Amino acid sequence: MEKKKVVLAYSGGLDTSVAIKWLQEKNYDIIALCLDLGEGKDLAFVKEKALSVGAIKSYMIDVQEEFANEYALMAMQAHTLYEGKYPLVSALSRPLIAKKLVEIAEQEGATAVAHGCTGKGNDQVRFEVSIQALNPYLEVIAPVREWKWSREEEIAYAKENDVPIPINLDSPFSIDQNLWGRSNECGILEDPWAAPPEDAYEMTLALEDTPNKPEFVEIGFEAGVPTTLNGTAYPLSELIKTLNAFAGKHGVGRIDHVENRLVGIKSREVYECPAAMTLITAHKELEDLTLVKEVAHFKPMIEQKITELIYNGLWFSPLKQALHAFLQETQKNVTGMVRVKLFKGHAIVEGRKSEYSLYDEKLATYTAQDEFNHDAAVGFISLFGLPTKVYSQVNQKKVEA
C-alpha cells in the first residue's frame, strides 16, 4: 500500500520525535517542519535530528520577521493581555505554525498535518481550528492525544525504537518560547502556593539581582509600529530582541498567572515578556496622546474581543479580520517618541511626544498662558446636566404629590 504524506510540526523534543516513529507505524511518510520564531534553539541540529529519527524531509524556516510584523505587532497594538495579565506568547505563534504546516502540506502534496499537543491544552484547539480555516480538506493528526501514554511508557517506546532521549528530559518544566516571550508550566509550578524557583526563569533577572540604577530607553513609533530604540532603527524582530535584553536585565515582564484555559480547566503558568510588556505600556501612552476621546474609550472593548479571539484560536476567523481592520484605522496617527524608565521590574513611561499630539498645553495650563474659555463652561454644564435636572424635577414632584 502506498504511503501517505504527513507534515509534522517538529520541535526536536521527545513528543514530536516519538511521533515520527509512531506515524511511520501508521504508514505515513513524515515531512518535519521546524520554524524559527526567535526561541534561540539550535535549529540546524533540530532539522538534522528529524531526518535521523526517520523523517523523509525536514524543513527549517526562519519566520521571525513575519511573526513580528504580522502577529506580535497586532497583539501590541491591541494591548492583548488575556485576563489582564498574559500577552498571548504561545497563542500568537500557533496560527503562524498552522499556516506554514498548510503551505508545506500543499506544496508537498501531503494529505495530513500533525502536531504534538496533548488533549488537555489550548494549543490543540488553536492548531486545528486554524488548519480547518486554511484548508478544511487536510486531515489533522494529534499523536500525543491519541496514544495516551504515560511519560514512562513514552520513554520506553523511544528506547525501543532508537529515538534519542533529550538531555533535558529530567527538567520538570514544559517551556515554550518565541520573540514575544517565554511560558513555563509543570513541575512545582503546578502548586499555585509554591513560589517559582529561579531556574524557572531565563529571560529576566530576579529583582534582587537587577541594577540599582535605572536605564532609560526611547522608543520611536511610526503609525503604531515600533521602529527605533534610542535613535537606532531596527527591523521589528530585532527591536523586540534588543528590548528583551534591555528590559529583562531589569526584571521587567515576569508574570505569575493562574489562567482559565479554553478547555475548561485552570492552569498556573509563569511568563517572561520583557519586550512585550514594555512595548504595550509605551504604545498605550502614545495612543493616550494621539487618539480622540471617543476612539480611546471605545478601543479597549475591541481589544478585549481581539484578545479572546486570539487566545481561543480564532486568528483566521471573519470577526478577527474585521476587528483588525478597525485596529489598523486607529493607528494612522500613533507616531512619536516614548521615554521609558526600566527599573526593578517596572517599565515606567516618563515622557511622550508626537507631531499628532492632541494635548494642547495652552488649553491645559493653569498659568497666565491659559487660553481655555472658562465662560463657555456655564452653558456646557447647563446643557450637559439638563436630562439629569429634568429627571430630578419630575420625580421630586411625584414624591411631593
From Swiss-Prot:
Q: Which reaction does it catalyse?
A: L-citrulline + L-aspartate + ATP = 2-(N(omega)-L-arginino)succinate + AMP + diphosphate + H(+)
Q: InterPro entries, alphabetically? A: Arginosuc_syn_C, Arginosuc_syn_N, Arginosuc_synth, Arginosuc_synth_CS, Arginosuc_synth_type_1_subfam, AS_cat/multimer_dom_body, Rossmann-like_a/b/a_fold
- EC annotation from Swiss-Prot or TrEMBL: 6.3.4.5
Which residues take part in binding L-citrulline? 86, 122, 126, 174, 183, 259, 271
Which amino acid positions bind ATP, per UniProt? 9-17, 116
Which HAMAP family does this chain map to?
Arg_succ_synth_type1
Protein name per UniProt: Argininosuccinate synthase
Encoding gene (name): argG
